[in-house]
Swiss-Prot record:
Protein name according to UniProt: Putative double-stranded DNA mimic protein CKO_01325
Function summary: May act as a double-stranded DNA (dsDNA) mimic. Probably regulates the activity of a dsDNA-binding protein.
Pfam families, per the entry: DUF440
Source species: Citrobacter koseri (strain ATCC BAA-895 / CDC 4225-83 / SGSC4696)
Similarity annotation: Belongs to the putative dsDNA mimic protein family.
Record InterPro entries: dsDNA_mimic_put (IPR007376), Put_dsDNA_mimic_sf (IPR036763)
Amino acid sequence: MEMDLNNRLTEDETLEQAYDIFLELAADNLDPADIILFNLQFEERGGAELFDPSEDWQEHVDFDLNPDFFAEVVIGLADSEDGEINDIFARVLLCREKDHKLCHILWRE
């Protein structure tokens, strides 16, 4: 799988794409109570944060997670508006190379 450093999603595009996928699939993967909580609280405490892929993705995928091309987006709620997300609803692994559409999601259990 050949990837081009000059053909990557920006950080903002990556966050936006991950959030769009989350919204599209949440109803099929989260409890209705969690969806209600998320929708009620997102405006004040919600967020999406971009990270390099964490090591534990290796348990779920069988390819190299080069941080130049892969990102993890954590979506959830924080205790305060500027706080760190500590109530995680989904962790989204995305390939940032535009010609290689790949997404894997670990949902809240």
